[in-house]
Amino acid sequence: MTDTNLTRRGFLGTTVGAAALAALPKMAFAKELLRMSTLGRGTSPNLVMTTFANIINKSLPDYEIQLNATGAATRHVLEVAMGRSDFCMSSPAIHALMRNKAAMFAKIDQAPELVKKLRTVLNFPMGVYHIAVYGSSGITSIDQIKGKRVFLGPPGGAAYATMERLFKAVAGFEEGTDYEAVKLGWDAAAAAFQDGNLDVYCNPTNAPSPALTQIAVTNQIRFLGIPADKLETEAVQKLVGRPGFSAAVLPAGAYGENQLNESDVTTLGVTVGIVSNEKADEDMIYQMTKAFYAGVAEAGDSSPWLKAVTPAAAVQDINLPLHPGALRALTELGVDIPDAARA
């Protein structure tokens, strides 16, 4: 998606562009407007992709990325594949489901062809699944959520499906029978948990999450995990073994003194990424990739949740080829490019 006005990049690409540049006022050039879809506020994809947009908008004058933080990633990838949007969050798991026309893509006949139109700009750790409860709730394990109001993730999204499967794998609980899955978006769910209107709040995010850190300042919280005796079961291993997923650890002290966990919590870790359409301009993607990692390095210790967002992580768990512009940028940044990242 681009602005139909004359852009600096497009103008300079014309025969007369360079010669006429001095004769035109600066205001004659319009930025190229680009749409990027991500998850709601409080999620790590929102934080990372907001940072991406801010860095690009500040450092590359030819472009302006406008964020859309509504809807599910499963819808966003279809929009990008169809050329209706420019960038979105996706994941190795979503790519596998599209190829196999499975789960939320089961009724979308063109999904296997549409995934071929997507290209990876970069991957990054989404973080670990936080399953949060208040200390005052008395809940200390997943098998104690029966009858509770639970936010799994937005309906129809990958997070919702993952948590629904995890609760069944660990405790045998069925949504709608053993607990109530509250249907909310990310923003509304964070507010509902903060207001005490949810018993259990699930959010895949890098630790420490700003949203949960804010809650932990004035409230005792606990994070529920996968018990050791359940980790090696077939049902849990099917979750852990999905593309982009792994068993991961949420440290006991990640949220300070008000985190009640006395030991580290075993949960699910997940890799996600930013994808574009295969037809996105190569030089544009190259410039954006280089500018983003330069901006992340400049942020340093001021943004601790960005520490895991590195050039090396850009190809972690990758199962969708890199866009040629990203491939060029990451190669220049010294990243060892796996075969799966090459078209």
Regions found by a protein language model. Name each.
Residues 2-19:
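N-terminal secretory signal peptides and thylakoid transit peptides that target proteins
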Residues 26-30:
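Sec/Tat signal peptide C-region and signal peptidase I cleavage site
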Residues 34-59, 63-66, 127-195, 302, ...:
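Bilobed "Venus flytrap"/periplasmic-binding protein-like clamshell domains
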Residues 50-54, 66-111, 187-193, 207-216, ...:
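Pocket-flanking alpha-helical
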Residues 109-124, 255-265:
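A structural signal for short loop-to-beta-strand junctions that line the ligand-binding cleft
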Residues 164-235:
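Ligand/cofactor pocket segment of small-molecule handling proteins
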Residues 224-287, 337-341:
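C-terminal lobe and pocket-closing loops
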Residues 293-310:
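Periplasmic-binding protein-like
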